[in-house]
């Protein structure tokens, strides 16, 4: 009697498990597709909206130990004109990968558009200077390309809530953007001061900056 019942129970359990397994697979695939939709396909960093959502969440939870960095590729048009668009894409992918590496698993990196990126990293205040210096070195390393390498130059601006007396993300981005512009083409990370946060802005960006006037007005 027992011998005949066990196979039937096993079959019944298997039959019940099949729809569950199918639903789990469907959910996993759906999650991957949704995640991919929020990622920039070239650099695999987060798109602007997804980056903003995650950065705001980090700021709400860890405002005492975060650093926001804005990065802008220098001489990018010249690189494209000289080496071709494939080389430009390779350089952008390298910037995204290096920012993601620098931000680490507890941080977030995103592509804001074109050759502009942002990263928010959790770093204890006593380690922030060293980590920013490391980022500057990281961004000057040549990018392997075909049988050689591409030169890479990136302008960097950094802002912390303590430095600008605000944990508001648009304020931090405005300050980091103004600091980055101040140190354009130097290869250094310029750290934002309180006055950088008061620079007139459009959509949280320094007024007059490329792309700042889209769907916004000066603040």
Annotate the PLM regions.
Residues 54-83, 110, 150, 216:
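Active-site-proximal structural segments of metal-dependent nucleotidyl cyclase/transferase enzymes
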Residues 1, 217-219:
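Non-catalytic regulatory/interaction regions at protein termini and inter-domain linkers
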Residues 148-179, 195:
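A short glycine-enriched loop-to-beta-strand structural element that forms part of the catalytic core
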Residues 35-53, 71-84, 93:
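Conserved nucleotide-binding and Mg2+-coordinating catalytic segments in signaling enzymes
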Residues 96-162:
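GGDEF/GGEEF active-site signature
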Residues 51, 55, 91-92, 96-99, ...:
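Heptad-repeat coiled-coil signal-transmission/dimerization helices
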Residues 2-41, 49-59, 65:
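Signal-transducing coiled-coil linker helices
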Residues 171-217:
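Catalytic/regulatory signature loops of cyclic-dinucleotide turnover enzymes
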């Amino acid at each position: 009697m027992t011998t005949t019942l066990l196979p039937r129970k096993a079959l019944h359990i298997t039959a019940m498990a099949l729809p569950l397994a199918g639903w789990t697979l469907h959910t996993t695939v759906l999650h991957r597709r949704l995640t991919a939709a929020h990622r920039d396909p070239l650099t695999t960093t987060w798109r602007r909206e997804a980056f903003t959502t995650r950065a705001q969440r980090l700021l709400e939870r860890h405002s005492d130990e975060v650093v926001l960095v804005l990065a802008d590729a220098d001489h990018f048009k010249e690189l494209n004109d000289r080496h071709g668009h494939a080389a430009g894409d390779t350089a952008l992918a390298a910037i995204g990968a290096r920012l993601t590496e620098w931000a680490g698993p507890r941080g977030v990196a995103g592509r804001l558009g074109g050759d502009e990126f942002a990263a928010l990293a959790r770093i204890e205040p006593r380690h922030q200077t060293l980590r920013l210096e490391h980022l500057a070195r990281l961004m000057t390393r040549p990018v392997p390309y075909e049988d050689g390498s591409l030169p890479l130059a990136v302008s960097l601006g950094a802002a912390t809530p303590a430095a600008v007396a605000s944990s508001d993300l648009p304020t931090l981005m405005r300050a980091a953007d103004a600091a980055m512009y101040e140190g354009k083409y130097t290869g250094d990370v310029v750290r934002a001061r309180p006055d950088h946060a008061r620079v007139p802005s459009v959509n949280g960006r320094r007024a007059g900056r490329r792309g700042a006037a889209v769907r916004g007005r000066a603040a």
